Amino acid sequence: MRWRPTTVLLLTALWLPAWPASAQQYEIDLSQIDTTAVLSSGGDVLRRAAPEAIDGLFQAVLHASREPGEARALCDLFEPDAARDLAAFQRTVDRLGPASRNRFANAFTQVALTGLQGPPQAFDPAAAQQVLRAAAVTATLLHDGFMLGLTSTGTDEASRAGRCRAFRQMVDVLKDQPQTQRVLATRWLLAEGLTLVADGQPAAR
């Protein structure tokens, strides 16, 4: 596939808006990315991204989730009713520290490159939920209050904090799973957030 001419500055602005120069210490090759396609089909790009690229995004989430000051930004992104397209990720990344922004910038570059030129990736929602339910069982054994936090549905601060804590604990469990399973789980979380992880019901389409 031949890439159309790109507007590198526009894509740079998409990934790195309003960051101080001292924070922009990245060496990312954006020359092969079709900016217009990324902006117009962000959700489709995520669905077509290669497994390795999705796992790179998981690793970026994992590292950021370990930082208390950054975890809440990620948790807001994975709330059941939150938008999780590329623009939403960018708004979240803007709230993170330089190291996490660097990881996400590299991960998104790979997602964009593979998602623009690749075919739709096979995805089994039932298998993804099975991976997440197994991770939830493990997290329940490791962490008191995990399931209570995971299944909370309120919009008050305590409920949101409980879901955030459960999200961080689940991500920590998923890191030890094979890449294939991590990718399945990540694709589900990108589409649905924490919705339906515990109750096992099929997602509405």
Regions found by a protein language model. Name each.
Residues W15-P20, L142:
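Hydrophobic membrane-targeting signal helices
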Residues A23-V111:
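N-terminal Sec/ER secretory leader and immediately downstream segment
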Residues L74-F78, A135-A136, R163-R165:
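Sequence contexts marking disulfide-bonded cysteines in secreted/extracellular proteins
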Residues A87-D156:
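Extended amphipathic alpha-helical interaction segments
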Residues T7-P17:
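Bacterial N-terminal signal peptides
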Residues M1-R4:
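Positively charged n-region of N-terminal signal peptides that target proteins for export
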Residues T155-R205:
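A cross-kingdom marker for long, charged
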